[in-house]
Amino acid sequence: MAEVETMNKKFLYSFVGFFPVLLLSYGVFTKNSNSNYTTNSGTRSSATAQKTEIVKGKNLKGTQFNAVDEQGRKLNFQIKDVELDPKDSEKETYLYTVFYLDSADSQWKNLCTPDAENVAKAIPLTGSWDETGKHTESSDIITFGCTSEVLAKCIRMGYKPWKTVKGKSLRDYHQACTRMTRADYCGNGKSHTRDGTPINIYDELGIQKKSPNSEMVFEAAWNPDGATFINRPRWFETVSEIRQECPNKLKGRINEDGDWTTAQKAKQNLPNSLLFNDSIVRKRD
């Protein structure tokens, strides 16, 4: 499905948006002998299929299918275009331009909104995410994450959930990235950031590396369930305000004394931390 080259660090940006745009019953798209497209979990063609051919990648261009969007609506969809992600040095990530048929005016419309680079495409991922941001793996469901939202952005940062790096699966790294990018400290789906906020992301696998000589300060350490340690909030909330949101979860995981610590110390005390980030120190006026 997808990976990216390790990015030259300008700085990455945090995003409020999360929720995936499409869930659908998934196996593999297939093409039978009379050229009707189906999924292996969907309704088969009325014609007898003598041969089933797996269709993937660019061969999916033009495929139409029925599926369910994030609001539970059954809609008609079409894959208008498929291309390799130009940011993926391994050339294994496909970007899909997915349209849906709007019943209000019978017009085909792009499912995704354009991102900062004016790209309105999606990357498919197995499983689903609920309103809290929790991921449930399933071989029968895929989720299309738009390039303007965190599911796809974390893949393009290098955290491909189907990959293994240095013997470690990147599934949990991808999930931790979705929490970190949105400053979802409690792991309950609530964001504590603003669109376009610069952050410096790094990990011990070397997928993302800390930028030297930045004016940013260590903010938090992360795993798939949210923050494992909060040194200081990204924006104007105080640590006490965030603690009130999930007091039991963050007990002993917040910098209480006001002396800022480092990611290295957090890693020593909390070895289950996967990702770390720095951010700009902000003060209320």
Could you say what each language-model-derived stretch is?
Residues 31, 49, 54-56, 60:
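Aromatic-enriched hydrophobic runs in primary sequence
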Residues 7-29:
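Sec-dependent N-terminal signal peptides
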Residues 26-40:
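Signal peptide processing junction and immediate N-terminal pro/mature segment
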Residues 56, 61, 66-285:
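Long, compositionally biased low-complexity segments
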Residues 37-54:
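Eukaryotic low-complexity, mixed-charge intrinsically disordered interaction/regulatory segments enriched
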Residues 1-6:
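Short, Lys/Arg-enriched N-terminal segments with co-localized hydrophobic residues
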